[in-house]
Amino acid sequence: MSEAKRRAAEKAIEYVENDMIIGVGTGSTVAYFIDALGHTPKRIKGAVSSSEQSTAHLKQHGIEVLELNHTGTLPLYVDGADECDPYKRLIKGGGASLTREKIIAEASKQFICIIDPNKQVATLGKFPLPIEVIPMARSLVARQIMARTDGQPVWREGVITDNGNVILDVHHLCITDPVKLEQELNQIPGVVCVGLFARRCADLVIIGSEPPHIL
């Protein structure tokens, strides 16, 4: 799948313009995009990064990393996904960077999602849904999730997000109404962010098939 990820990432470079400040996500597919950014003749002004991992990678290529508070609205955000349905709604957060990813997506005019073909699904939920949670609320949130859904929350032990929080991965969901579930789970006290990108879904999905396919 590495070649599929590379194809999707390199196709996304076509949407990058000189002097842009762009949002950059996190993950294995995004790593290919950052490498492509470092080698393209196009010269961006800088990037807003969704994780410490991506920040380090961008700096390795000499790309300036900027604070979102200082940039305002971004023209473009490029990120991967763990699942994508036919309506460009996503599950994200396998890399535990979902909160910053959702913030940057909201701050961007165009959100391009780059995936390999295996990430396409008819219905979201086979991949466990990540939820970022305030540490003291972990058990409370888990009980609330079980009361409100058919899912089984599992604490991702040993993982602390860049924001100092923990992750619950909710297994065995069949998400027929992603927007509604995203709203409902966001109401639970202690939830920082739900890894459903349904209300703010991707504007464009690049699938790294041969040749790349645009959804």
UniProtKB/Swiss-Prot annotation:
SUPFAM superfamilies: D-ribose-5-phosphate isomerase (RpiA), lid domain, NagB/RpiA/CoA transferase-like. Transmembrane segments: none annotated. The keyword NADP does not apply. Coiled coil: none annotated. Substrate binds at T26, G27, S28, T29, D79, G80, A81, D82, K92, G93, G94, G95, K119. It is an enzyme of class 5 (isomerase). It comes from the Bacteria. It holds the Pfam family Rib_5-P_isom_A. GO terms for molecular function: ribose-5-phosphate isomerase activity. The active site is at E101. It catalyses: aldehydo-D-ribose 5-phosphate = D-ribulose 5-phosphate. One of its GO terms (biological process) is pentose-phosphate shunt, non-oxidative branch. Pathway: Carbohydrate degradation; pentose phosphate pathway; D-ribose 5-phosphate from D-ribulose 5-phosphate (non-oxidative stage): step 1/1. InterPro entries: NagB/RpiA_transferase-like, Ribose5P_isomerase_typA_subgr, Ribose5P_isomerase_type_A. Homodimer. HAMAP family: Rib_5P_isom_A (MF_00170). Catalyzes the reversible conversion of ribose-5-phosphate to ribulose 5-phosphate. Belongs to the ribose 5-phosphate isomerase family. This is Ribose-5-phosphate isomerase A. It comes from Xylella fastidiosa (strain Temecula1 / ATCC 700964). The gene is rpiA.
